[in-house]
């Protein structure tokens, strides 16, 4: 095939195969074929695909070399298939990432593997050792034989289970828990009297339950007597 036939195949009125450019109108065709970009790509194309069928030039000219068969590295980079308008542009390319990456691939060097970020969902929170919650001695179940809170004895575990789930035990447990809560606000005399009965010595009144006693302590009458005491 003649070189003219090759040129006609590469450069048609509607498509430039060297630049992979679609040419729609006459003005676009003329502007493209006369552009500097097209000329540079054509020059590089024939460097890589000589018309005489010989091997493409792959060696770069040395600093003082005069070998005409070698390619000027300041004009084009055969490795990246790029042409340059000046030595400054060429130097910028050779120091860039694209050229360095292709050079590593050519030399067979392995590119470092990218470290993948660990998903947040797979990160486990640090373990925090917390002290075990110790129940109040009045709330926990003493044994299957005896309940110290209610002073009750059991013949078997089933009877003990029924007692601990019953109203009497729960009421006594709630009463003791409330006494422990009130212990921070009452003096020892009031606390000892409360353990025997539900009587308020400040107001000289007796209540029927620990709940009523607790409500009385929060009432306005008790607060007034407490201030005037």
Swiss-Prot record:
Gene Ontology cellular component terms for the protein in this record: nucleus
Short name of any one Pfam family annotated for the protein: zf-C2H2_jaz
InterPro entries cross-referenced by the UniProt entry: Matrin/U1-like-C_Znf_C2H2, ZN346_ZMAT4, Znf_C2H2_jaz, Znf_C2H2_sf, Znf_C2H2_type
Primary site of residence: nucleus
Keyword Kinase: no
Keyword set, alphabetical order: DNA-binding, Metal-binding, Nucleus, Repeat, Zinc, Zinc-finger
ZnF region ranges: Matrin-type: 14-44, 72-106, 145-175, 198-228
GO MF terms held by the record: DNA binding; zinc ion binding
UniProt region (Disordered), positions on chain: 117-137
SMART domains, per database record: ZnF_C2H2, ZnF_U1
Tagged with keyword Repeat: yes
Localization: Nucleus
PANTHER family in alphabetical order: ZINC FINGER MATRIN-TYPE PROTEIN 4, ZINC FINGER PROTEIN 385B-LIKE
Name of the protein this chain belongs to: Zinc finger matrin-type protein 4
Gene giving rise to this polypeptide: ZMAT4
